[in-house]
Regions:
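Residue-level signature of tetratricopeptide-repeat
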Residues: 77-78, 111, 145
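A conserved position within tetratricopeptide repeats
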Residues: 10-11, 26-29, 64, 98, ...
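TPR-repeat structural position
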Residues: 15-18, 53, 87, 121
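Terminal, low-structured helical/coil segments at or just beyond the last alpha-helical repeat
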Residues: 133-156
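Register position in tetratricopeptide repeats
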Residues: 49, 83, 117, 150-152
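TPR-adjacent "capping" and linker segments in tetratricopeptide-repeat scaffold/adaptor proteins
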Residues: 1, 26-39, 155
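Alpha-helical adaptor scaffolds
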Residues: 34-106
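Alpha-solenoid helical repeat scaffolds
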Residues: 7, 23-26, 61, 95, ...
Length: 156
């Protein structure tokens, strides 16, 4: 399955096919084309899983410095910074990811979560809508959109 085919399947009516397509996309997005860089990505992911956020951040920064065009390096550093509750920095990293891969539903949703945490509900709602335009079956984005819209109503 090509990336284009996977993105098309995400938008289809078959939920199981969309889930498979999402998995295919994540696999594609985790491959840089260079085994050494893929090893750095894996090293950073393992540091995140150990909750070694400084180590993960350092590893992803090395990856970004060596392969600035590799969107997933930026996305993973965004995740680390979100986990560290540095939402402004995570937003900047999500933007870098999206500049390289505009269909990265993980970065779209992640940026939306950052705006939600900052109380920027309109921005969050917009990002969750954009996420759902790419991946309509992503339940967390649907739930987070409802939350953002509910908060907007409370403010008005």
């Amino acid at each position: 399955m090509t990336e284009r085919e996977a993105l098309t399947a995400l938008r289809g009516d078959d939920v199981a096919q969309a889930a498979r397509a999402a998995g295919v996309l994540w696999q594609m997005w985790h491959r840089s084309g260079d085994p050494r860089l893929d090893g750095l990505l894996q090293e950073g992911i393992e540091a995140m899983q150990r909750e070694d956020l400084p180590g993960a951040d350092t590893t992803f920064t090395r990856l970004i410095n060596e392969a600035p065009a590799f969107a997933e390096g930026w996305n993973k550093r965004a995740t680390v910074r979100y986990m560290a509750q540095d939402y402004a920095a995570a937003i900047a990293e999500c933007r870098e990811t999206l500049a390289r891969n505009p269909n990265h539903f993980g970065a779209l949703s992640g940026q939306g979560l950052c705006h939600l945490m900052l109380g920027q509900f309109s921005e969050a709602a917009d990002l969750f809508r954009r996420t759902l335009a790419v991946h309509p079956h992503l339940g967390s984005a649907r739930d987070n959109l409802r939350t953002a819209l509910s908060e907007i109503v409370k403010l008005n």
